[in-house]
């Protein structure tokens, strides 16, 4: 299930609106993004006026959304059934060298081996990861249902809080000023890496995130104040009362010298690892480029 309806960034106040305006005046034109700046009146005309308490918006046209808990198993089934890919689950890969992979299910020889360990930097080739000084970030996430005033949301919704988090905005002068405002008014949002992202599910519910806590391991204990802050932000953005139906943690790699690393190990082995939050966005393209570069 793929939604191709773009995304919507809403400005809750004049400080956030200034960031959207600067982005539209500069980067939008320079980079050729397909997006429109929306006035307060334009925003009020969306979703039966339920977002009219915002003062500006930015509507992107090229963003795609999937429901990952269904899409990822569907991709696995397609690869197995349509393309004949063999998946060996419940197995640990313990060593890899020159096309030979040693696992708990036996040894496998390949013309070229691609090591894609996610945020596991210790099991395979730890000496390759150590110089990168990578960390792990742990996110608190919510799935929520409307209790009042349901909004027929058909695309991801963000607010100006995301403008201090995402690189397309965060280095703009107005975004630096916005960060100072947030630090002065609600420092716990920055301390916990909280910004608001609301994604509708195919079943009328909402995925709400997220927070960011960094370290060498994923801290196992959720902070209820963080969940409450995210739920309050989502309720305010949508003008609706929400009820949490599910909570979980997301974990991925973070920091390092770049968003991702592709490292040749030997003539028959390549490591490809993501250490930023854009894996769902660019991971398939990185995979295609890495395979093509190694085996043509």
Regions found by a protein language model. Give the residues of each.
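Dinucleotide-binding Rossmann-like beta1-alpha1 core, especially the glycine-rich loop
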Residues: 1-46
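C-terminal catalytic lobe of FAD-dependent flavoproteins
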Residues: 193-195, 201-207, 213-296
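A short coil-to-beta-strand element that immediately follows conserved catalytic motifs
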Residues: 2-4, 88, 154-156, 238-250
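Helix-loop-beta segment of a Rossmann-like dinucleotide-binding subdomain
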Residues: 2-9, 44-83, 211-214, 268-273
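Helical element adjacent to the flavin cofactor pocket in flavoenzyme catalytic cores
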Residues: 57-112, 116-117
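Contiguous C-terminal substrate-recognition/catalytic subdomains in enzyme active sites
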Residues: 157-161, 165, 170-222
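Central helical "cap/lid" subdomain
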Residues: 107-173
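Glycine-rich nucleotide phosphate-binding loop and flanking beta-alpha elements
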Residues: 16, 120-122, 214
């Amino acid at each position: 299930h793929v939604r191709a309806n773009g995304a919507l960034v809403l400005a809750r106040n004049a400080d956030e609106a200034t960031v959207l305006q600067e982005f539209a005046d500069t980067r939008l034109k320079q980079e050729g993004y397909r997006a429109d700046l929306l006035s307060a009146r334009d925003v009020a005309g969306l979703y039966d006026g339920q977002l009219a308490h915002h003062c500006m918006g930015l509507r992107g046209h090229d963003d795609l959304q999937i429901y990952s808990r269904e899409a990822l198993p569907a991709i696995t089934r397609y690869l197995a059934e349509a393309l004949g890919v063999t998946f060996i689950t419940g197995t640990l890969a313990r060593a890899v060298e020159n096309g030979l992979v040693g696992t708990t299910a036996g040894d496998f020889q390949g013309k070229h081996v691609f090591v894609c360990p996610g945020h596991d930097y210790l099991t395979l080739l730890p000496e390759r990861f150590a110089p990168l000084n990578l960390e792990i970030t742990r996110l608190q996430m919510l799935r929520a249902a409307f209790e009042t005033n349901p909004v027929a949301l058909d695309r991801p919704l963000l607010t100006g809080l995301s403008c201090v988090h995402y690189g397309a905005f965060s280095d703009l002068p107005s975004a630096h000023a916005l960060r100072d405002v947030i630090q002065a008014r609600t420092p716990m949002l920055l301390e916990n890496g909280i910004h608001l992202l609301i994604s509708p599910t195919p079943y009328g519910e909402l995925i709400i995130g997220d927070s960011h806590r960094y370290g060498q391991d994923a801290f196992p204990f959720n902070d209820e104040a963080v969940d409450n802050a995210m739920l309050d932000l989502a309720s305010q953005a949508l003008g609706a009362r929400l009820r949490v139906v599910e909570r979980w943690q997301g974990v991925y790699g973070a920091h390092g010298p770049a968003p991702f690393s592709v490292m040749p190990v030997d003539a028959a082995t390549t490591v490809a690892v993501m250490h930023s939050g854009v894996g769902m966005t660019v991971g398939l393209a990185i995979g295609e480029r890495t395979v093509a570069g190694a085996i043509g």
